[in-house]
Design a protein with these regions (language model features):
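Bacterial N-terminal signal peptides
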Residues: 8-18
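Predominantly soluble domains enriched in secretory-pathway, periplasmic, or organellar proteins
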Residues: 22-393
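Bacterial N-terminal signal peptides that target proteins for export
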Residues: 1-8
Length: 393
C-alpha cells in the first residue's frame, strides 16, 4: 500500500472514530464539596450524560478550580468559543477558550463586583454584562479582550435603581438589558423588582415591581429570559420567594415593558422556582422548582401566556436544566448553594419522548460528597477533542 493511500485510510478511520465519539452527550458540571467534608474542593467536570452510552455518568476529565472560589454559573459567548464562570466567593470572572486544548482558566479581575451571578453577551459578541448581587451593580466588559469597561449602578431612592441583581437578559434589537432584584447575599433583605437598562450605554431607565402583593412583597425575582422568536419581545421571570411565573411584554410604541403574573406554583405544592429553558423552536418552556424538586413544562406557543402542561419530578434543589441536542432527553441538576434540604447533588434524566418519564439519576458527584452547581452541554467543537481522552472516575 502506498504511503498516500495509507494516509488516506488513516484519515478515514480517524474521522469515523471522531464521528462516533461526537455522538456522545457531554456536559460541563462545575461542582463543590458538600458541607462537612474534611477537604473542600471545586472543579469543572466533563461528564458523559448520554443514557445510551457505555460511559454514562462517567467523568472523562476535570478542570480544577480554586477551592475558595465558589464557582456558580457557566455561560457561553454567542459562538460558544468561550465559557465564562462566575464566582460568589471572589471578585473574579474566569474565562476558558474553548478552541484550545488543554483548557486553561484565565482570571478576569472585576474589583467592583461582589457575588458575581449571571452573565449575558451581546448579539455581536463584543460586550458582556455581569450581575453582581453583593455590590448591587452590573459590570459591562469587552468580550473580545475580556476586560471590564464600565460599572453600572443606581441606588435607591432613585425611581430606577439596581438592587441585588441576579438574573439578566439582553435583546439588542430593542437595545435593552433587564436585570432582576433578588436577595441580599446574607438573605437579610429581599427584592421585588426588575430594572431595565439601555444595552448600548448602560443607562438605567426604569424599575418595575414584580408582585401583586403590597410592598415589601419580598418576591425575589431571580431569573429572566427572552422567549425565543417572540415579536414583540416577551420576557419570562421566576420569583424565587413568592413562587410565581411572570411575563413582560415590550410595547414598541411606548418603548417600554408591561409586566403581569402568568402562573402560581403554590397550588401544585411547589416552591422556589429558579431556572428556565426553552426548546429550539421556542414553543416549549421548562421551569425548575427547588422545593421539593420539579420541572414544569409549558406550551409556549403564545409566550404572552404560557400554558402549564405537566410537572415532572426531579430531586430537591432542582435548578439548571439542559436538553439533549435532539431534545429527547432533559437533564436537571439538583442543588442550590449547598443549602440543606435543597441540595440533593444528583442529575435527573428525563425522557421527553416517553411523556416525561424519569429514567433515573446520575449520582456520580453526589456519591463522592459533591454538589453540582450548574450543568451546560459541551459545544460540538469541544467534543471532537475528547475522542481519545478517558480519565474516568
Amino acid at each position: 500500500m502506498t504511503p498516500l493511500r495509507l494516509l488516506s485510510l488513516t484519515c478515514v478511520l480517524l474521522l469515523s472514530t471522531t464521528s462516533l465519539a461526537s455522538a456522545e452527550i457531554l456536559a460541563l458540571l462545575n461542582y463543590e464539596s458538600k458541607p462537612g467534608q474534611p477537604v473542600r474542593r471545586e472543579a469543572i467536570a466533563i461528564m458523559d450524560i448520554d443514557p445510551e452510552s457505555a460511559d454514562f455518568g462517567k467523568i472523562l476529565m476535570e478542570v480544577p478550580l480554586p477551592s475558595d472560589l465558589v464557582a456558580h454559573h457557566i455561560f457561553f459567548n454567542r459562538d460558544r468559543t468561550k465559557a465564562y464562570i462566575t464566582a460568589l466567593g471572589k471578585p473574579l470572572l474566569h474565562v476558558v477558550d474553548l478552541t484550545r486544548f488543554p483548557y486553561r482558566l484565565r482570571a478576569i479581575a472585576v474589583p467592583d463586583c461582589q457575588v458575581g451571578e449571571d452573565l449575558v453577551v451581546s448579539e455581536d459578541n463584543r460586550t458582556w454584562y455581569l450581575t453582581c448581587m453583593g455590590s448591587s451593580n452590573v459590570i459591562m466588559g469587552d468580550a473580545v479582550r475580556d476586560v471590564p469597561i464600565k460599572t453600572v449602578s443606581a441606588a435607591e431612592p432613585a425611581a430606577a435603581f439596581i438592587l441585588y441583581p441576579h438574573g439578566i437578559a439582553i435583546h439588542n434589537g430593542i437595545d435593552r438589558v433587564l436585570v432582576t432584584s433578588s436577595v441580599k447575599p446574607d438573605m437579610s433583605d429581599v427584592g421585588e423588582s426588575v430594572t431595565v437598562l439601555e444595552a448600548s450605554t448602560g443607562n438605567v431607565l426604569s424599575t418595575h415591581k414584580i408582585s401583586m402583593k403590597p410592598s415589601p412583597a419580598k418576591s425575589a425575582p431571580v431569573e429572566i429570559m427572552f422567549s425565543p422568536h417572540a415579536n414583540p419581545p416577551v420576557v419570562h421571570i421566576t420569583t424565587m420567594m413568592e413562587g410565581t411565573l411572570w411575563a413582560g411584554i415590550w410595547d414598541p410604541k411606548a418603548q417600554s415593558f408591561s409586566f403581569y403574573q402568568v402562573d402560581d406554583f403554590g397550588p401544585r405544592q411547589q416552591g422556589m422556582p429558579l431556572e428556565m429553558l426553552y426548546n429550539k423552536k421556542g414553543d416549549r418552556l421548562y421551569v425548575t422548582t427547588a422545593k421539593p424538586g420539579f420541572v414544569n413544562l409549558y406550551d409556549n406557543t403564545d409566550p404572552r401566556q404560557p400554558k402549564f402542561l405537566q410537572a415532572i419530578p426531579a430531586a430537591p434543589g432542582a435548578h439548571h436544566a439542559v436538553l439533549s441536542p435532539d431534545e429527547r432527553y432533559l437533564f436537571v441538576q439538583n442543588s442550590l448553594l449547598n443549602l440543606e434540604g435543597i441540595s440533593d447533588g444528583s442529575v435527573t434524566v428525563i425522557d421527553l419522548s416517553k411523556g416525561g418519564k424519569v429514567l433515573g439519576s446520575i449520582d456520580t458527584l453526589k456519591a463522592q460528597g459533591f454538589n453540582p452547581n450548574c450543568i451546560m452541554l459541551l459545544p460540538n467543537h469541544f467534543q471532537l477533542q475528547h475522542s481519545t481522552l478517558r480519565v474516568s472516575r
